[in-house]
Regions:
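Conserved beta-strand segments of alpha/beta enzyme cores
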Residues: 24, 72-74, 149
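Cofactor-binding loop segments of dinucleotide-utilizing enzymes, especially the Rossmann-like FAD-
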Residues: 8, 53-54, 107, 131
Length: 174
């Protein structure tokens, strides 16, 4: 199992905090968001990573190589980070997966290591972690059928039909 971490974005909504620091290197209780993400994967036995960078990529590369020198981490640059989104970054990561299973993660989310464990032990081929709570307009909502097959994932889908919010951690089986 591999992990693909998307860390190319500018995070303009967090300015001035992200003026000189990538969002994933912002600290929460003394630990960066990226550090928390990597540690959650490592604690679940995943040590093969691809990080798609873009905005202030050298800061991300320097941080990761200094703090995780023994991990197998590759970097791909999304040179078009200012005009593209996560889908393009995922497209750039396609060759890394090489037909193997992988978990996709945004670099700027807070989540428990238990979510990774649940993704790894789930017997379904492709799974998506979600949060069940009262939904608003901004959440990325999930609509599924009665067998839990995902029918739609979107910010603009019906709140009434949605079963939860995507937390940004899908596992893909190749």
């Amino acid at each position: 199992m591999k992990a693909v971490i998307l860390a190319a974005g500018v995070a303009s909504r967090l300015r001035p905090l992200t003026e000189n620091t990538p969002k994933c290197l912002l600290k929460v209780n003394g630990k960066t968001l990226l550090e928390r993400t990597l540690d959650n994967f490592i604690e679940n036995g995943i040590t093969d990573f691809l990080i798609v960078t873009g905005y202030l990529q050298n800061m991300i590369i320097d941080f990761v190589t200094a703090n995780y020198p023994k991990l197998n981490i590759k970097f791909i640059e999304n040179k078009d980070y200012s005009t593209t989104n996560n889908i393009y970054s995922l497209y750039l990561a396609e060759s890394f997966a090489g037909g193997e299973d992988f978990i996709l993660s945004d670099s700027d989310i807070l989540f428990s290591k238990d979510i990774i464990s649940a993704l790894l032990t789930n017997n379904n081929p492709d799974v998506l972690a979600m949060n069940r709570h009262e939904l608003g307009e901004e959440e990325i909502k999930i609509i599924s059928d009665n067998e839990c097959n995902v029918l739609e994932i979107s910010k603009v889908c019906s709140i009434e039909k949605a079963v939860g919010e995507s937390v940004g951690l899908p596992r893909f089986v190749q």
